[in-house]
């Protein structure tokens, strides 16, 4: 099977990889130490990169997550600049950060299913 990955998908994967390198090697902000980039999606015209992140053991509403959001927003220009330097793109995409709630939602759904299955009839 010869499935070719689309250019936006390849660029999104490379941006995710690049951001992880930047976070782990080049940032000194302690609020970003435990941040993990879970996914990156990019618009078809490659102008906007939507980046999802999480911190293990932390919910979106917890203070460490809120601090990380503030730090990422403050440093988004730095991240964009570094992406531009490290990747050979005609246009460096705008970077938008969002806390990834998939794990939280999955945990909540599992809990609801467990309760429903073990409810006394």
UniProtKB/Swiss-Prot annotation:
SUPFAM superfamilies: Ribosome-binding factor A, RbfA (SSF89919)
Assigned keywords, A-Z: Cytoplasm, Ribosome biogenesis
GO biological process: maturation of SSU-rRNA
Gene Ontology terms, MF aspect: ribosomal small subunit binding
Primary location recorded for the protein, binned into one broad class: cytoplasm
Any Pfam family the entry gives: RBFA
Localization per record: Cytoplasm
Gene Ontology cellular-component annotations: cytosol
Keyword Cytoplasm: yes
Quaternary context: Monomer. Binds 30S ribosomal subunits, but not 50S ribosomal subunits or 70S ribosomes.
NCBIfam families according to UniProt: rbfA
Family assignment from sequence similarity: Belongs to the RbfA family.
HAMAP family: RbfA (MF_00003)
Protein's job: One of several proteins that assist in the late maturation steps of the functional core of the 30S ribosomal subunit. Associates with free 30S ribosomal subunits (but not with 30S subunits that are part of 70S ribosomes or polysomes). Required for efficient processing of 16S rRNA. May interact with the 5'-terminal helix region of 16S rRNA.
Official protein name in the record: Ribosome-binding factor A
Species of the source: Hydrogenovibrio crunogenus (strain DSM 25203 / XCL-2) (Thiomicrospira crunogena)
